[in-house]
Amino acid sequence: MKLKRILTTLTTAALITSAVALSPSATAQEEGETKLGLNALTNVLNVAEYQFDSNLADFDILTYLALDVMGAKPNSAVWALADGNVKMTAFLPTDRAFKKLVKALTGTSYVRERKIYLAVRALGFDTVEKVLLYHVVLGAPILSEAAVAANGADLTTAEGSTIRVAFDGTTLRLRDKDTKRINPNVILTRVDINEGNNQVAHTINGVLLPKLG
């Protein structure tokens, strides 16, 4: 599937989701129940206008990798990021997080985002898909306050294995299955992205790794 086709598909899906959100049946809610919005995380990632740049604090590499998997695997669960009806919490690694991962894996510290992206992409679509799904927890969105209160809890990811929440009073850390590298931290100044919708996200400073190979 070509990139243009993927973007067209995502744009169409966003329009349909918006229409559903505005329909009378969608706005009807149970008494006392808060109705969450349907804005998908692909809109937050801005898939229509993303590009490599010098800003390592954003999500360009993550966006490219997600679109790669969507293109290579039309039935991948990664597509759920584009479906605002699917409730989830996603932990989003920054471009700098991928830079640290590539350096740890290859010993090379790339400056340009494109080279970092290509190094991760070289792991193969199956591995990239597995890693991306390991950053997604399906179910009711978990806001940062609840995450902090969930110290010691194991969260089951869309990949199938778990990540453990660890909060020491100042740092919110996510413990993955990789025992060789430092566990990622949640960047507490960049949490609750897309709050009020079925899909929320929190920024992390490292890439979560499931068991690979």
Give each language-model segment a name.
Residues 17-25:
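C-terminal segment of classical bacterial N-terminal signal peptides
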Residues 1-11:
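Bacterial N-terminal signal peptides that target proteins for export
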Residues 13-14, 153:
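Repetitive helical segments and hydrophobic/amphipathic motifs
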Residues 5, 25-213:
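Mature, structured domains of secreted/extracytosolic soluble proteins
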